[in-house]
């Protein structure tokens, strides 16, 4: 019987995935590197090693490519901040670019549309997910009450610049990392939709393998028949 679960990898144990029905949540204590299941995935690998402040990050940079590999293997979605270098490192298409060799494609969204306190611009990478389903269910709009990062008032005054969210509060690191419940539910729904697509791909791959084996068997059978005929001493013409 095919599982109806999806796996959420590299997630916060206090976040929304841990309590969601049908979600197998893998936080740091479970070590998402060990996931070898066939269920589609939602992946949130650490962004520090691939962001603008990567030289200060102590996160494991190998988790990003591993998360990409999982999405390409079983289907689903990967979430990372806008401009993440992980996209270049793993040759994922940026939003607006053609799909890659895995059928993967990307979309830019803002998590404020699902209830985050800040805009939190995000890039999503999909494999096995129908773009029509995504565009039919994606949200836009929303007004932030906080800003993820902004310079101090002294820096703004010294440089004579106008900061877009100067009147907003700065988010704490906890608020910044938080995934809105509605956003998580949307990603889970999209990842679940990849199950049939990825199953069809596997079936086609298996069918191709069977055909290759069948052709080889035919050739081997012909060779065996010819050898048997020669051994039987068929009269020469």
Regions from the PLM with identified roles:
Residues 1-208, 212-221, 235-237:
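Class I S-adenosyl-L-methionine
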